[in-house]
Amino acid sequence: MDNRPIGFLDSGVGGLTVVRELMRQLPHEEVIYIGDSARAPYGPRPAEQIRAYTWQLVNFLLTKDVKMIVIACNTATAVVWEEVKEKLDIPVLGVILPGASAAIKSTASGRIGVIGTPMTVSSDIYRQKIEALSPEMQVESLACPKFVPLVESNELHSSLTKKVVYETLQPLAGRVDTLVLGCTHYPLLRPIIQNRMGPDVKLIDSGAECVRDISVLLNYFEINRSREKQELNHQFYTTANAKSFSEIAESWLRLKVNVEHVSL
């Protein structure tokens, strides 16, 4: 048993999609979350900058004595997950490999689409992971640079967002039977994405898939939190406006959250 919290980091609010799934599957675990909304999106930034920012978030979580870190950001996972995993003595998970594995299991045609930030797509990491596991798969990747700013602005249901999503996803329409949401912000746009792609296209939420791996590692290292009834003290931090962050967090998680502003 280990009653310390699990640390989550993201470029902004996107990682909350992973936290929501964790709270559904592992409701007894405690969460500390840091979202770097002041510097979002990470996707267009150079790799060295993403690496530096991610390490700042990692080091912040380490000051909170977390027992595990989840890099709940595809861009940061693509750039620096391997490095962080090797340097820390606690488990560190990323969100890409779980999403790649789930896509392979889902597809019937072998035609998989991946949408993500410019950095995630240019890294080609999803195609590499998918083809390493199943070489016969055909992967089409598409950068969606406008999606994260829309989510960070809480423009989840506007006519502008629908227009942007429909136009951006045009190149993949009718070409794949499985679509990996290769950015943890994207599930917040899931209804619009599903409508654009059609009901027969299976959407893979890479962050939600990651929670299954979290559960496996908690069991493997015997660091599950005690299941005895006790009050959880979830903590949420943002580098941007705490009120804006809490509005999105409370809507998505369906619970009252206290959000603190931090400067890194």
Swiss-Prot record:
GO biological process entries: cell wall organization; peptidoglycan biosynthetic process; regulation of cell shape
Gene Ontology molecular-function annotations: glutamate racemase activity
SUPFAM superfamilies reported for this sequence: Aspartate/glutamate racemase (SSF53681)
Superkingdom classification of source: Bacteria
UniProt keyword Cell wall biogenesis/degradation present: yes
A Pfam match: Asp_Glu_race
Descriptive protein name: Glutamate racemase
Active-site residues per Swiss-Prot or TrEMBL entry: C73, C183
Family designation: Belongs to the aspartate/glutamate racemases family.
Protein role: Provides the (R)-glutamate required for cell wall biosynthesis.
Keyword Magnesium: no
Gene name of the encoded protein: murI
Reaction catalyzed: L-glutamate = D-glutamate
EC code(s) of this entry: 5.1.1.3
